[in-house]
Amino acid sequence: MNKSELRKIMSVKRNSLTDEEKIHKSRKIFENLLDTANLADVSCIFIFVSYRSECDTTPIIDYCIDNGIKVAVPRVNGDKMDFYVIRDKSELSIGSYGILEPVTDTIIYPDEKSLIIMPGLVFDIKGNRIGYGGGYYDKYISEYNLGLKAAICFDFQIIEENIIEVEDTDVVPDMIITDSRNIDVAKLRS
């Protein structure tokens, strides 16, 4: 299957989740993230604001804000994505593609102690990722390749075979955190 076919299949599957299933699975992802990443040691969490049937990132964002952990969320300008610090969710407004984006102007860049949370539609067991086709995260991480890169998704979004077509510009996360497991991609690829 090509990327387009895999995107379509996984979108249908993810969109079929009930609200209750999505809430439960998203909560488990949040708990697994807390078990895996020592957020107290993170200088800033770079995280997407969930949209439609994606894993709900609200609990992660709320937890970080409530615990004094710096939060940065993306805003797309043309073909470029930057991250902006937010202090609470009132600093978000509907932007590109109907996705909540920051209204603040405080751009921040990752450092060695940053945690970058990546979205995706499909992953294989080696961490190869199919996003939404814009390449925003691939470009951003290629330019600012610092910190720990973790993808979050529902477990059914992982294909056990290593079948995703890979391009030179594709970025692989260090780990994938799902509602039922944490995959150490860096270890599997070494």
Predicted regions and their residues:
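N-terminal active-site beta-alpha-beta segment that forms phosphate/nucleotide-binding
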Residues: 1-111
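Surface-exposed, charge/polar-rich loops and edge strands
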Residues: 5, 12, 111-116, 125-128, ...
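A short, acidic beta-alpha loop adjacent to the nucleotide-sugar donor pocket found in many GT-B
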Residues: 122
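Short polar/charged helix/loop
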Residues: 133
